[in-house]
């Protein structure tokens, strides 16, 4: 349930979210999203060093609703 919520919110923010059966989401966003979130004290997994992937590919864990909301708020903040 929480994975669907988080995926939907990322999609609303213009991110490409890939289907997942695991407790994390893989998505494509802005190439500098990792650096911007890091400045806000939030670390997401930059997947650009995975074979075949590029800058702007990320992975995040699906957590409790309040934690997912905090992450989404930080993403919204750095994208303003």
Regions found by a protein language model. Name each.
Residues 13-16, 43-48:
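A short linear hydrophobic-aromatic micro-motif
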């Amino acid at each position: 349930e929480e994975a669907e919520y988080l995926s939907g919110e990322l999609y609303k923010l213009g991110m490409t979210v890939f289907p997942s059966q695991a407790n994390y989401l893989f998505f494509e966003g802005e190439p500098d999203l990792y650096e911007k979130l890091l400045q806000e004290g939030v670390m997401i997994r930059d997947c650009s060093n995975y074979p075949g992937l590029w800058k702007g590919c990320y992975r995040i864990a699906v957590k409790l609703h309040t934690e997912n909301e905090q992450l989404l708020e930080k993403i919204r903040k750095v994208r303003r």
